[in-house]
């Protein structure tokens, strides 16, 4: 006897999907992610607020034993940015983290070197002829190896990689279908966020002039993403600036003056335009792809 009794089976639980945010919200998320990552070292450093004597000892740049481990906490933005961009990419863009540039390929090291070389070239070529306008050589104030470690940590792990992962990785992926718009938006937001950066500015007007430099090298970095399909040249530009300033301090070269900021910005802007022209001559692309 055939049993024709059919019972309604309970529906399988629906997979919870994070709602996709509108484009404007995903764009404005970029500066928030960048700021959270930038201030993340306060988390591992927070216990020091209860021990002011220990904090003073660790913050002494002449104290190599103490300052070196404290410098390692400045690498926390890399950890924070990786987590935040992973969360944003997988939940809001529904794409893997590697699409934002968090990958290392055979080409990555060379591309990082290109960014480093460009940053050194622009930094020194635009500063050396204008030393008469500079305000003094930067004082390292610490043993050489600590200064080098500080430049690498700040240039790569505190600023270079996390900021480029957010601004050139996440943000340009949000706008991936409009490459030139992605370049423009990431450049403007990156530049504006540097208004409160400390670079030797002595007035509100100088703060505006100072913005030209990070805005220009942000433009150059974004152009490199289109041409090379990688964020590593941009990371190299960031790290190269810090290492170039360290080398300049050792050589007696100064970099702080409105004239140098403006000339340096012109140097990065010209380099960015050249990179965009190369990208266009190679056929351009209809979307931002990061796979190297």
Q: Where are the regions a protein language model picked out?
A:
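Short, Lys/Arg-rich, polar N-terminal cytosolic tail immediately upstream
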Residues: 1-23
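Short, highly charged, low-complexity non-transmembrane loops/tails of multi-pass membrane proteins
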Residues: 5-10, 59, 285-292
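Membrane-interface helix/loop boundary segments of multi-pass membrane proteins
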Residues: 161-186, 226-230
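Hydrophobic alpha-helical transmembrane segments
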Residues: 24-32, 71-72, 109-117, 149, ...
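Small-polar-interrupted transmembrane alpha-helices in polytopic inner-membrane proteins
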Residues: 156, 179-195
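C-terminal membrane module of polytopic membrane proteins
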Residues: 239-292
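Juxtamembrane helix-loop-helix connectors linking adjacent transmembrane helices
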Residues: 5, 46-71, 94-162, 177, ...
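Hydrophobic core of alpha-helical transmembrane segments in multi-pass integral membrane proteins
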Residues: 34-42, 77-88, 118-128, 263-284
């Amino acid at each position: 006897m055939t049993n024709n009794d059919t019972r309604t089976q309970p529906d399988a639980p629906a997979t919870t999907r994070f709602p996709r945010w509108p484009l404007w919200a995903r764009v404005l998320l970029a500066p928030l992610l960048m700021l959270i990552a930038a201030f993340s070292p306060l988390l591992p450093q927070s216990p020091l607020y209860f021990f002011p004597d220990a904090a003073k000892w660790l913050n002494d740049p002449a104290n190599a034993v103490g300052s070196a481990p404290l410098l390692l906490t400045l690498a926390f933005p890399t950890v924070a940015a990786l987590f935040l961009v992973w969360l944003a990419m997988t939940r809001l863009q529904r794409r893997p983290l590697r699409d934002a540039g968090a990958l290392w390929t055979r080409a990555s090291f060379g591309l990082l070197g290109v960014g480093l070389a460009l940053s050194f070239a622009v930094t020194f070529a635009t500063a050396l002829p204008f030393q008469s306008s500079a305000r003094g050589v930067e004082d390292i104030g610490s043993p050489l190896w600590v200064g080098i470690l500080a430049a690498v940590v700040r240039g790569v792990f505190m600023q270079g990689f996390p900021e480029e992962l957010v601004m050139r990785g996440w943000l340009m992926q949000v706008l991936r279908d409009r490459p030139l718009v992605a370049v423009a938006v990431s450049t403007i937001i990156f530049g504006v966020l540097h208004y409160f950066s400390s670079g030797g500015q002595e007035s509100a007007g100088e703060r505006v002039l100072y913005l030209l430099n990070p805005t220009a090298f942000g433009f150059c970095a974004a152009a490199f993403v289109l041409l090379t399909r990688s964020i590593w040249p941009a990371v190299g530009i960031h790290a190269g600036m810090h290492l170039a300033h360290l080398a300049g301090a050792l050589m007696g070269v100064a970099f702080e003056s409105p004239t140098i900021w403006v000339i340096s910005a012109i140097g990065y802007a010209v380099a960015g335009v050249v990179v965009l022209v190369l990208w266009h001559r190679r056929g351009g692309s209809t979307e931002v792809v990061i796979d190297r």
